[in-house]
């Protein structure tokens, strides 16, 4: 066997005993050059690295993927535009629902009345301070509304033309880029999921009602819809009954400076834009609310690098601490100088009582239960503590402490709104609950009933029990004229509790209130609603001095209008003449004409012959 192999080592193997070992190339090059030249085993196969799919399919797949990547910004722009429109309508509808709340309407009316008395600079400062608390969504919403208001203003054509943004080069480039998208035959293929029942709005408000309540905001949203329809050829979906993509909770619009962040957006359907070649893509005409670069002539907003958006607010409420209420509108974390109302004359906030935790357990539990109950009845609205509880102390109360009484004047909830039980109160060292405090309040109100002509202002619904020890009363019991009431414990003999009457501080000067001397048995000087004048208008001594005569009639505000006339000329004036003299109030004119008739009767009877 071995000899046979050795003998055939340099020749072709036998057909019956072929070797499985391939011939060496070094042997074949010498004796079998023809066969060596035809042997292809030493060369790699050109099909060895070929994949399963043909190369054409791989090439076109890569090209298609590149096109899809190029069209992602267009997809995101369309989603951003629709999300903005949906967010604006959501904000507008929530505003309308909040405006219909009676409590909010009362609070808003009080704010508007306060705002009307401010100067232009104070209004600007107040608005600027409030804008610092806005979120990115609110900022974009206000930008659209303010632009609409500016265009509807009659002076906008002179200061800033309404169509200025459509004339600059940047807007022309963006509009041209968007107009190319309208040529696609598949522009109407934007698929959307069916309406989500969980995303429906349940406000029950008609769109016409909302538009009538906020015309400028509704016009701004309608303009955004018209722009979307004009640029894409598709009318935006009616998001009063469905969301744009998936559930409404996923439509949290990203920040302006980071439009590529799509983590908060639901998965959109297929791209509405058809695939095109790999030519350079022009920038898409994105809506102004989501564009990082504003056109010329328009206000730009700060990027997220300068001001980060506010943290997301949740409705999770824990038991608040007494020294730092979590639900206070004047929370330290969000406080600003505009949150402190007007300039205080005394300490802005009194020091709160630090009680042992065991005595505060029921207070914390009751307060937490009330807040959770309010949250369960008001949808998506966080019930804050009453802002009036944090108002500054009144100047005439000082710090609200007396040196000779063991009374704690820092009563928590002493300024709570009527109808809502406030926190427990410390009165004369005892902790009173809501029922005991209500009984004490009723007793104090019954004691003051003889000196009140109308109910106490709801601004101060609770009398501090500690004030009773000094005989103090609320300055609002008698309206704004309470300071002139001699029965007011703050003046007159009421200062005896403070030991100041010996210094002659018991007197007063000027005009008395409606119920000034009722309790002393004297006739009231000009009670409102009575037709009898406060003093005899036919007194010759008063008629000699017109300013004093008008002062006795409580008409001294018209002294400058009538002081140049004699009494004989004054009583001859009629209603028209009084109005020409500047007596614009109808009640004042009627009162004057009635007194003029009395003076004329006294003159005809001869009572005024001594000064005629």
UniProtKB/Swiss-Prot annotation:
Enumerate the SUPFAM superfamilies for this protein.
SAM/Pointed domain
Q: Give Gene Ontology CC terms.
A: cytosol; P-body
> Where is the signal peptide, in residue numbers?
none
Q: Please give the positions of the paired cysteines in each disulfide bond.
A: none
Sorted alphabetically, which InterPro entries does this protein's record hold?
Answer: SAM (IPR001660), SAM/pointed_sf (IPR013761), SMAUG/VTS1_RNA-bind (IPR050897), VTS1_SAM (IPR037635)
Q: Which GO terms describe its molecular function?
A: mRNA binding; nucleotide binding
| Compositionally biased intervals (Basic and acidic residues) | 511-520
Region of interest called Disordered, as start-end residue ranges on this chain: 1-74, 184-209, 253-311, 391-411, 511-544
Q: Report if keyword Lyase is assigned.
A: no
One matching Pfam family: SAM_2
Question: Per UniProt, which keywords does this protein have?
Answer: Cytoplasm, Nucleotide-binding, Protein transport, RNA-binding, Transport
The record's listing under PANTHER family reads:
PROTEIN SMAUG, STERILE ALPHA MOTIF DOMAIN CONTAINING PROTEIN 4-RELATED
Family recorded in the similarity comment: Belongs to the VTS1 family.
Q: Return the protein name.
A: RNA-binding protein vts1
Q: Supply the source organism for this entry.
A: Aspergillus fumigatus (strain ATCC MYA-4609 / CBS 101355 / FGSC A1100 / Af293) (Neosartorya fumigata)
